[in-house]
């Protein structure tokens, strides 16, 4: 998948950020040809509540993202391997890192697990929002 990928913390952060700040960040990533970001559908499990009113801002933000619904068997196997090598991290985090290969950028609010998973990945960079 590579490119710019957002985890649940980053989705929630951008959804709650001020409109001016969000537009500024989008402009920066857009100038680097990294916008719109990709959001694997499994991330929605962590950033949505199932309550329409509580999720309204997140749904609005996600309309501007490329929500990816495919986790192939090979990506799932790669995620399992990365998780085993790291000895930590959730299945969702491992899937994000596997999908970011090669040379992808993941924006997160929780750097520890993703950094451990990315240590064995091909050129995946983790940045904290």
Report residues per predicted region:
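Non-catalytic, well-ordered alpha-helical scaffold segments
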Residues: 41-45, 94-97
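Conserved beta-strand termini and adjacent loop/short-helix elements that scaffold enzyme active sites
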Residues: 40-42, 70-73, 127-129
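Short, well-structured N-terminal submotif of metal-dependent ribonuclease cores
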Residues: 1-38, 48-66, 127
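Alpha-helix/helix-capping structural signal
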Residues: 9-10, 42, 112
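Short, basic/aromatic-enriched C-terminal tail that caps enzymatic domains
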Residues: 116-129
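Amphipathic alpha-helical segments within well-ordered protein domains
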Residues: 44-48, 80
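Active-site neighborhoods of divalent-metal-dependent phosphate/nucleic-acid chemistry enzymes
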Residues: 68-112, 118
């Amino acid at each position: 998948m590579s490119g710019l990928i957002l985890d649940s913390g980053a989705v929630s952060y951008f959804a709650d950020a001020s409109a001016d700040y969000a537009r500024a960040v989008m402009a920066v990533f857009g100038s680097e040809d990294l916008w719109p970001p990709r959001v694997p559908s499994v991330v929605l499990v962590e950033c949505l509540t199932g309550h329409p009113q509580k999720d309204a801002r997140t749904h609005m933000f996600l309309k501007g993202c490329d929500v990816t619904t495919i986790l192939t068997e090979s990506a799932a196997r790669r995620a399992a391997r990365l998780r085993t090598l790291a000895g930590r991290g959730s299945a969702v985090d491992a899937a994000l890192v596997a999908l970011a290969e090669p040379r992808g950028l993941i924006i997160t609010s929780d750097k520890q697990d993703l950094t451990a998973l990315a240590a064995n990945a091909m050129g995946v960079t983790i940045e904290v929002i």
